[in-house]
Each structure stands twice: as C-alpha cells, then as structure tokens.
C-alpha cells in the first residue's frame, strides 16, 4: 500500500507488519523531501514513525484520543491523517501547520507548541469520557525532555491517584529534547533504558504462580505482593518511580520494532488503568546525518539531502541577535565569575551554547522548567550571583507567577533576555513573542528595554547586569542589521533614557526595539511626500523618558507609536497612559499587533497581513492624520 493512498488512519488496521514497515519508509522519504526543501522539524518526527504506525493500528481515531506533546513529533501523524498531498505547504502561509492544530484536522485532538501539556490534556479527556459513560481510549505521547517539565509530573501525580481511569502515557525516550535533557530524571531514564522489559517479566512471574498446585487461577493478595517484590529483585529500580506513583510500567521497548510495539500497546489498552509505556527511539532515525547530530537536526532550514548541509542563502545575512547576545555574555562572564547564564533546554536557540562550551561552570540548563529557572535565578541573586535568564518570550509566559512573586515583589537583580520577541514566523501562534511587553509591564520594579540594533543590545546587556533590580531585555528572532559590535568596553545606558534619531516637525514616531528600523524606513517614505518626521528610539518601555517624549509630543501634536507586540497593554498603551497621567491631550496612533492570533507564515508575510510593513504604515499615518491634503 502507498502512503499517498491512505485516506484515513483506520486503514492501517488491516495491514501486515511488513506493509507497515513499507509505509514507514515512505513516511521518512516524504518527511525528508519536504523538510529539506522548505525547512522544519526533522529529527523528532523521524524518530517516531514506527511508534505512530503501531499505536494507530491499535486505535480507532474516529473515537479514541491521542495527544501529542509539543507537536515536534507530529509530522508522521499528519502524513497518515489526510495531509499527505498538502504536506509540501508545511509551515507556509495558509499551509499545513508545523504543530498539531484542532482547527486543521479532526484527528488533531489537542493543539500544542509548548512542552509538557499532553498528560494533563489526555487525563482531562479520560475523566470526561468516564463521566459520560463512554469507553474510548485516551493516550498521551510525551518525550523524555518534556517529562522534565513540572506540569507533566503534576499530571502523573494526579493520574496515578485515579487507579480506575484508563490512560496510556507513551514515553518517547530518545535521550533528547531539543538539546540533551538534564537532571536526575534524565539520569534515571538512562539507567532504565539499558534494562530488560519489566511488565513482561512481571507477567511471566504471574503465569508461574498460576501453575502452582492448590492455587490455580486465583492469586491471593499476598502473592500479588510477593510478585511485585520478585519483580523488583529481578530488575532493580526499573520503572519503580512510575509504579510508586500509581502507574503500571511497561518497557523499555524498542521503538522501531513495529510488531513488538503493537503487542505492547494492545497489552497496555487491556489493563484499563494508568499505564506508562516506555519506548526507546532514535531521534533522526533513518537519516544518518540527523542520527549523528541530533541537536543540529532537531529543526533545519532547507538543506541538501545528499550532503546534509544547509543550503546557503543567496545573500549573506548578518549574525543573529541570539549569537551576538551569547558572544557578549561570554565576554562578560570571562570578566566576572558571578555572572551565570541560565536556560530552559534552549542553549543553542538562545545563544548560550557558546557559554556552555567555554565556561560550563557559569552555565545552567534546568531542562524544560521555566518556572524553576526563574525562581532558581531569584535564589542565586539573593546570595550575590548575577543570573542572566535567556528564554524565549513565548516560554516565559509559563513563569508569570514566579516573575511577580519571586522576582518582582522582592526587587531582585535578575536579568531576563527574551529571545524570539515579536513575530517569529513559521512556528505560528503558539510561538509568537507578542505578549511580553504587556504581561511584564504590569509587574512592579521591572525595567523593560529593547535594542534598535546589535550594538545597543550589548549596551543593554551590561546595563541589565549592572542594575540593582529586575530587568527584561527583548530581542527579535533572526539576523541583526549588520551593525558593528564591540568585544569589550560597552557603555551602560542610563535607565529610562530615550534618544532622538531624526528631527522633524510634522509627525513624531516613537518606536520600540525592532520597530525602530521600520520607523526609519517609514520616515523615508513620508519624506518623499514632504512630511518631516521626528523619530525617537524609546529604548525603554518602563520607565519611559517622559522628559524627552512629552515636550516633543506637545510641540509636534501628532504622535505615532510602533511596536512588534500586541497593542493591548503594550508600548503604545504605555505612551497613552503617560500622556493621560500628565494631562497631555494629544492624539496617539498606535501601530502594532491587534487582538488577533498570528498564524504561521514568513515574518514578512505576517507583518504584511498585520499592516506592519513600512509602506503600509506610511499610508496609515497619512490617512490617520489627513496629511495628503
């Protein structure tokens, strides 16, 4: 059977193991073809092909529920649930999303982009099923990296307390999240991974007991307890953590042996209780380059399938903001041993990999544990260290209470560097960094800043580390502007001090962070229409430079704010509040992201749809203030 002919996942039910293995090869071929052409997540999906096929042969996806954690693993799922022909549009505007999305397919039972949510969602579905008197199966598929997240452990704790609630948790253990997982749980799984299967040994003990004369089929409770003890003696520690938490543990199982996987899943479904099936897979399976470099091939831009090398862009791009940050922090750490870089499983993405390689004693990776990262940093700062928490804007949302309770209220000197702030592109609404200005501006004691270019990033970083209270510095995804940077001698900024970049009397544009460059382009367009613009680089949204902004606004009388963030509670709102609090009655036109979810597309496509391109903004300004008369 051809993968392209598969119209419904239930069509897998009648296939032989050899036919499923053939489809597995076709899935990998299609997966590699599309990702090598347009980019996307590579390694995670390649590792779960057999797991997906075997699991779906044991389920009826018209009624059963499967929740995939994160969604990185979801490409094989998409290919066998009716999206084969559209898969070329992966992560492109109006195309197939890179993550599971309920609005895209009835088989995407729960959307996700952030880690560690699957067990909670699947347990919620299982409880709803039981309350309604239904009997369909509920399954969560979670990676070992996502299992380090506190939310996953909270869900396991809850599910284990419900012994009569059938739930299957499939642990896809590839010894890797995006980067290698860290912590005691990861070390524990490493030991388990090398052990023989547990549940089947347990069953063989039970069969032996059944054959004892005088007992027959009835096994007294005492002997059941003995069975458990024998199991522990035979395979010490294997699965003990999960069993003590109320789960029946099965595994570890070879995640690329389809026949064994099918048998295991069928056995798990029959138990009618919380079960954890431990599957050992190879991230990047079937593509040697991805197997050899599991971090580098987690996600890829377009690459040559033959060589595995990225296809260079036609025009060389400047160094990314993330790398500039990482390189600068490394220099600072070399000069000050109290500075500590902290990440939540995103060393490469945030640029901290260079610190990890060069000064590992000043680097901490907490795993997928954003809440812990924030409070860990707070504790460090209490005793004289200078923590710098590098984290994606979208992921810091998960630690909002810790920002308030553990950092803001205590006014602790913790520096946050919010990567991927603003429009991120192909990862879509779960990853857009559009909310951080709004959610952090409300926290007392925080100083919020954003650089206009790479050089200002360096100055803001040293400003943050030197500041005696909490700070948040937001940087955009992707390349910088090509502005020269320094290896040392960065001059700190005065907190709350903006700068005038261009003088003009017709319009005042106050721009924040990445939108400063767009403001300059917009001003050039307006200049061609004899409209002279005053451009202010705000630098800070909290505190604002009211001594600069209010006099300029009072003189020019027409104010435009520009931000790459949501308008509700954002930078523009801060300007309006400043004027209102100081009884300045001046019209303000706010340009930013309206109250919408920004879907997957290229950053420029998203900005164009939102009206954030310079030519669009120039037209809006002309219409708003009737400057074309």
UniProtKB/Swiss-Prot annotation:
Q: In which pathway does it act?
A: Metabolic intermediate biosynthesis; 1-deoxy-D-xylulose 5-phosphate biosynthesis; 1-deoxy-D-xylulose 5-phosphate from D-glyceraldehyde 3-phosphate and pyruvate: step 1/1
One Gene Ontology term from the biological process aspect of the record: isopentenyl diphosphate biosynthetic process, methylerythritol 4-phosphate pathway
**Keywords of the record:** Isoprene biosynthesis, Magnesium, Metal-binding, Thiamine biosynthesis, Thiamine pyrophosphate, Transferase
- GO CC annotations? cytosol
Q: At the top level of its lineage, which domain of life is listed?
A: Bacteria
What job does the chain carry out?
Catalyzes the acyloin condensation reaction between C atoms 2 and 3 of pyruvate and glyceraldehyde 3-phosphate to yield 1-deoxy-D-xylulose-5-phosphate (DXP).
Top-rank EC class of the record's enzyme: transferase
Q: How is the cofactor bound?
A: Binds 1 Mg(2+) ion per subunit.
Q: What Gene Ontology terms describe what this protein does at the molecular function level? A: 1-deoxy-D-xylulose-5-phosphate synthase activity; magnesium ion binding; thiamine pyrophosphate binding
**Family membership:** Belongs to the transketolase family. DXPS subfamily.
Residues binding thiamine diphosphate: 72, 113-115, 145-146, 174, 287, 370
The reaction(s) this protein catalyses: D-glyceraldehyde 3-phosphate + pyruvate + H(+) = 1-deoxy-D-xylulose 5-phosphate + CO2
Which Cys-Cys disulfides exist here? none
Query: What Pfam families does this protein map onto?
Result: DXP_synthase_N, Transket_pyr, Transketolase_C
Q: What is this protein called?
A: 1-deoxy-D-xylulose-5-phosphate synthase
Q: Report the EC number(s), separated by commas if there are several.
A: 2.2.1.7
Q: How does it assemble?
A: Homodimer.
UniProt cross-references to InterPro entries, sorted A to Z = Dxylulose-5-P_synthase, THDP-binding, Transketo_C/PFOR_II, Transketolase-like_Pyr-bd, Transketolase_BS, Transketolase_C, Transketolase_CS
Under CDD domains, the record lists: TPP_DXS (cd02007), TPP_PYR_DXS_TK_like (cd07033)
Q: Which cofactor does it need?
A: Mg(2+); thiamine diphosphate
Gene behind the chain: dxs
Q: Which residues of this UniProt protein bind Mg(2+)?
A: 144, 174
């Amino acid at each position: 059977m051809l993968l392209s002919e598969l119209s419904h996942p239930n069509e897998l039910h009648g296939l032989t193991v050899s036919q499923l293995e053939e489809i597995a090869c076709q899935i990998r071929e299609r997966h590699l073809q599309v990702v090598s052409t347009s980019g996307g997540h590579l390694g995670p999906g390649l590792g779960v092909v057999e797991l997906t096929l075997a699991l779906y042969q044991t389920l009826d996806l018209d009624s059963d529920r499967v929740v995939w954690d994160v969604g990185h693993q979801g490409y094989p799922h998409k290919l066998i649930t009716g999206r084969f022909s559209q898969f070329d549009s992966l992560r492109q505007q109006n195309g197939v999303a890179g993550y599971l999305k309920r609005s895209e397919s009835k088989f995407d039972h729960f959307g996700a982009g952030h880690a560690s949510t699957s067990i909670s969602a699947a347990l919620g579905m299982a409880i709803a099923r039981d309350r309604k008197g239904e009997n369909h199966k509920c399954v969560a598929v979670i990676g070992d990296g996502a299992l380090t997240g506190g939310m996953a452990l909270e869900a396991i704790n809850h599910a284990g307390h419900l012994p009569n609630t059938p739930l299957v948790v499939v642990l896809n253990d590839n010894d890797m999240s995006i980067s290698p997982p860290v912590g005691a749980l990861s070390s524990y799984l490493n030991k388990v991974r090398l052990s023989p299967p547990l549940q089947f040994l347990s069953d063989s003990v039970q069969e032996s007991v059944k054959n004892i004369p005088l007992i027959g089929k009835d096994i007294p409770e005492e002997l059941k307890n003995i069975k458990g003890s024998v199991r522990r003696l035979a395979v010490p520690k294997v699965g003990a953590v999960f069993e003590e938490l109320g789960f029946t543990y099965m595994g570890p199982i070879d995640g690329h042996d389809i026949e064994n996987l099918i048998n295991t899943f069928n056995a798990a479904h029959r138990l009618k209780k919380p079960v954890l099936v431990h599957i050992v897979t190879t991230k990047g399976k079937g593509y040697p380059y991805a197997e050899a470099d599991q971090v580098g091939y987690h996600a890829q831009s377009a690459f040559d399938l033959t060589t595995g090398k990225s296809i260079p862009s036609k025009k060389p791009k400047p160094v990314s903001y993330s790398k500039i940050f990482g390189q600068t922090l490394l220099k600072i750490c070399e000069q000050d041993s109290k500075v500590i870089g902290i990440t939540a499983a995103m060393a490469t993405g945030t640029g901290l990999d260079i610190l990890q390689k060069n000064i590992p004693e000043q680097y901490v990776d907490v795993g997928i544990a954003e809440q812990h990262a924030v409070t860990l940093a707070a504790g460090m700062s209490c005793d004289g260290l200078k923590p710098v928490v590098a984290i994606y804007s979208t992921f810091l949302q998960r630690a909002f209470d810790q920002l308030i309770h553990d950092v803001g209220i205590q006014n602790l000197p913790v520096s946050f560097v919010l990567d991927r702030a603003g429009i991120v592109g192909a990862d879509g609404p779960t990853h857009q960094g559009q909310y951080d200005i709004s959610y952090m501006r409300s926290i007392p004691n925080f100083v919020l800043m954003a650089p206009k270019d790479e050089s200002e990033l360096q100055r803001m970083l040293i400003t943050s580390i030197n500041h005696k209270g909490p700070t948040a510095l937001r940087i955009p995804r992707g390349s910088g502007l090509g502005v020269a940077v320094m290896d040392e001698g960065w001059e700190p900024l005065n907190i709350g001090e903006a700068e005038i970049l261009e003088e003009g009397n017709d319009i005042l544009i106050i721009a924040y962070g990445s939108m400063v460059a767009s403001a300059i382009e917009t001003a050039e367009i307006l200049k061609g229409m004899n409209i002279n613009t005053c451009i202010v680089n705000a630098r800070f949204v909290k505190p604002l430079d009211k001594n600069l902004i209010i006099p300029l606004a009072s003189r020019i009388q027409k104010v435009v704010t520009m931000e790459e963030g949501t308008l509700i509670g954002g930078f523009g709102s801060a300007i309006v509040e400043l004027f209102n609090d100081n009884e300045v009655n001046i019209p303000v036109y706010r340009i930013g992201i309206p109250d919408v979810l920004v879907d997957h597309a290229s950053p420029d496509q998203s900005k164009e749809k939102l009206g954030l391109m310079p030519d669009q903004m120039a037209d809006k300004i002309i219409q708003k203030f009737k400057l074309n008369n």
